[in-house]
C-alpha cells in the first residue's frame, strides 16, 4: 500500500489496554522511545493489533499533541 504521509514510525506493540469502545496502544519505536495512540476496538480487531506485533504508526503533523 502506498500513502502520502511522510511521518511513518515502525515499532513493536508493547502495551494494549482495551476499554469499552476504544483501546490504548503503546508502540516502542527506534531508540526505545514509545508513542501511545487511542484507536477503536473495531480497528484493533481489523488490524490484528496484539502485544508483540510489528506495526507502522502514521502521524499527521496537524494531529500531534504534546504532554508535559
From Swiss-Prot:
Pfam families: TOBE. GO terms for biological process: molybdate ion transport. Keywords: Molybdenum. The keyword Cell membrane does not apply. Residues 2-68 form the Mop domain. PROSITE patterns: MOP (PS51866). It comes from the Bacteria. Binds one mole of molybdenum per mole of protein and contains a pterin. This is Molybdenum-pterin-binding protein 2. It comes from Clostridium pasteurianum.
